Curated annotation (Swiss-Prot):
Protein name: Probable ribonuclease FAU-1
Assigned EC number: 3.1.26.-
Highest taxon in the source lineage: Archaea
GO biological process, one term: rRNA processing
Family: Belongs to the FAU-1 family.
Naturally occurring in which organism (per UniProt): Pyrobaculum arsenaticum (strain DSM 13514 / JCM 11321 / PZ6)
């Protein structure tokens, strides 16, 4: 039985599912413990699940067997988009510097190195993965040794630090421990993890001693590309509207839940959503349209979790299409269209309800359309944040005709998508279209 710590806006649904799947939920919040009648269990987790920054998904990290077991069950239930990191978080390896700020690790993977470190090209050293590579995003590795346990982490930074989730009164206890029994480790580098707040001093001290011995062994190094210590598996899981609907069903089995609960929670709604849950009623579309009247941003989420945030001003809703206006910064070239962005250029973005695409038409300062870019994506969710997940294939329309873009990128990352989302071209319009202030128009 794997131990899972679950946090965030999906916590009720995922806790319900995790318990059904045979996981033991540890360190629950008071609200979750009360809802499920859980007995206090402050054991360190095998897997931690928390919100992704976009609030349209989660990140899962921990013991690889536990992470894979959780992802397997979640995929079966909610059919989400899943991106797995190519290297493990806190993995320690022998790397060879291939530039002033890059290092080559196991399997030829190249990591960025923070600029505060000075590298000598060609030199080898010991590195730790501090941000794993995922999708096209490079990982980040630091020339430090980090040895992580359940309660503490020993490192070579020379600092003592504490998880942000450790309350002030517990931090005082741990600070005293660092200055007494753990003094020799604190001088090297020591970080107290969130589970340390629940652990007795003896358990923390015993773990620190074992980690120190392991650190000494690791410091002997090895050959370039060698992994000296395995880290934690890491994955990004994104929920489109269909996956969120399944999570709504799971939550509804525990507490009153309106349709669209998780989509509205991703919009940042708090107490008013709790009220809607208890009052009941099918109000999702009306609530989403109301929030869209003050739309402030477009969240264009890549399947590996990267979020492109674009500020937008609402123009209005036109026949089931939300129209937004975005200012463009001069300089650069419009993707897929090849027109240089001049001062005063702007974009009108049309977000049709229930469709698998978003339309961006670009205009000069005088209001002349210069081209349209259509993204294939999951069905967009309306609100103060317009949220959708990029399916990586696009179409561009301009005076030169129509072009399909980025098919090669989609094919490279197709395995991240569930089968139901693996035909992005079918979601795109077959004829040229434009986004105008009156909505989407077909070009004759």
């Amino acid at each position: 039985m794997y131990r899972a710590r679950i946090r965030g806006i999906y916590a009720t649904a995922l806790t319900k599912l995790a318990l059904d799947w045979g996981f033991k939920v540890v360190q629950p919040t008071e609200k979750i413990a009360r809802r499920f009648g859980l007995e206090p269990d402050f054991s360190p987790p095998d897997i931690t699940v928390k919100d992704h920054e976009s609030k349209t998904g989660i990140v899962a990290m921990g013991l690889c067997e536990a992470v894979e077991a959780f992802l397997s069950k979640l995929t079966e239930y909610a059919d989400p988009i899943v991106a797995r990191a190519r290297a493990r978080l806190k993995e320690v390896f022998v790397g060879r510097a291939v530039g002033e700020a890059t290092v080559e690790g196991p399997g030829g993977e190249v990591f960025d190195v923070p600029r505060r470190y000075v590298l000598t090209p060609g030199a080898t050293g010991i590195y730790t993965v501090v941000r794993p590579p995922i999708g096209p995003l490079k990982g980040v590795a630091a020339p430090e040794i980090v040895v992580e346990g359940q309660y503490v982490e020993l490192n070579t930074t020379g600092r003592v630090s504490y998880s942000e989730h450790i309350p002030a009164e517990e931090a005082v206890r741990l600070r005293i421990l660092a200055e007494t029994r753990l003094r020799q480790y604190a001088s090297i580098g020591l970080r107290f993890k969130s589970s340390a707040r629940y652990a007795p001093d003896d358990a923390i001290a015993a773990e620190a001693e074992a980690l120190y011995k392991e650190m000494l062994e690791i410091s002997k190094g090895g050959s370039p590309g060698q992994v000296l210590r395995r880290g934690k598996c890491f994955a990004v899981v994104l929920f489109d509207s269909a996956s969120k609907a399944r999570l709504d069903e799971a939550r509804a089995a525990v507490v009153p839940t309106v349709r669209g609960h998780h989509a509205l929670r991703a919009q940042g709604l708090g107490k008013c959503l709790d009220l809607l849950d208890h009052v009941g009623g099918d109000v999702y579309e009306k609530a989403a349209e109301f929030l869209a009247g003050e739309a402030a941003a477009v969240y264009h989420v890549k399947p590996w979790g990267e979020v492109v945030k674009m500020r937008a001003e609402p123009v209005g809703v036109r026949g089931g299409v939300l129209v937004l206006r975005r200012r463009l910064r001069p300089g650069g070239v419009l993707d897929g269209i090849g027109v240089k962005i001049e001062r005063g250029f702007y974009a009108l973005t049309c977000v049709p309800r229930g469709k698998g695409y978003v339309v961006h038409t670009y205009y000069t300062a005088e209001g002349k359309a210069v081209g349209t870019y259509v993204n294939a994506n999951t069905v967009p969710e309306w609100g103060r944040r317009v949220i959708y997940i990029d399916l990586l294939v696009d179409k561009a329309f301009d005076g030169g005709g129509e072009r399909v873009l980025d098919l090669d990128e989609y094919e490279k990352y197709a395995e991240m998508f569930p089968q139901r989302l693996r035909d992005p071209l079918s979601r795109l319009p077959k004829t040229p279209i434009w986004c105008t202030e009156e909505g989407i128009k077909t070009v004759a």
